[in-house]
């Protein structure tokens, strides 16, 4: 009997909420990507119809990191609550971490320590 291949479950889903944060969002995403961890994680970035360069910056990161970053671009403003709960619904992780688009993690071992 042949065994089915099973993909390792995502340990942590990192939810990033953005709205007009072009000056900060790169630092936020970079602080996630610099994590030194053996955890399998995904990044779900939900942009709430930003009118600045935030969507373009996120598209660039999604193109460079398609295996880990899932991008949801809203065409009209839906608000923080809807944006958050939609990303939560889409998440596959056993655990959830939240990072606002204008914030960043200083510790490159944050995920490993926290989870």
What are these regions (language model features)?
Residues 1-115:
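Nucleotide-sugar donor-binding/catalytic module of glycosyltransferases
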């Amino acid at each position: 009997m042949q065994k089915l291949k099973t993909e390792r479950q995502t340990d942590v889903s990192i939810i990033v909420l953005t709205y007009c944060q072009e000056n900060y969002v790169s630092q936020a995403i970079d602080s996630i990507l610099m994590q030194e961890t053996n955890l399998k994680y995904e990044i779900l970035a939900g942009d709430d119809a930003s009118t600045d360069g935030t969507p373009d910056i996120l598209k660039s990161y999604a193109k460079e990191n398609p295996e880990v970053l899932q991008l949801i671009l809203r065409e009209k403003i839906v608000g923080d609550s809807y944006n958050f709960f939609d990303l939560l619904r889409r998440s596959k992780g056993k655990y959830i971490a939240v990072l606002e688009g204008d914030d960043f993690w200083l510790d490159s071992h944050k995920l490993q320590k926290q989870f």
